[in-house]
Amino acid sequence: VLLLLAVMGVTTVLSGLISAGPTAAAMMPVVLALADGPLAAQSDWLAVAFAASICAGSSLFLWSATAGLLMASKVEDARIVPDDDGHPPQPYRWGVGPYLRYGAIHAGVQFSIAAAWVLVVL
């Protein structure tokens, strides 16, 4: 189970860094080796855990979210100005830093749910 959780963690981070498709292709030999070896009895659940960790990683960074870069562009184009707090108004910028606060939380919640599910099922 710890090996599967480690593979899920690596898959989540890779999916965030290089996107879901390449991560699925790169990690598939590892998942198939686990399905043929120590986790053969749970191979169906292994595929679900693999997919869940790819989904979690897809939320992690702005560039790995499906519409992340488009959303950042649209927020800047909207020229949203935050409420007056005594400072001169500045248009709101939605980039990697602001997105990461939400993306990391969302990916963490998704990964935690997937890991808890793995611990219950396996």
Sequence positions of predicted segments:
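Membrane-interfacial helix-loop connectors
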Residues: V1-G86
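Juxtamembrane boundary at the C-terminal end of a transmembrane helix
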Residues: A115-L122
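Entry/N-cap segments of selected transmembrane alpha helices
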Residues: V1-V13, L100-I113
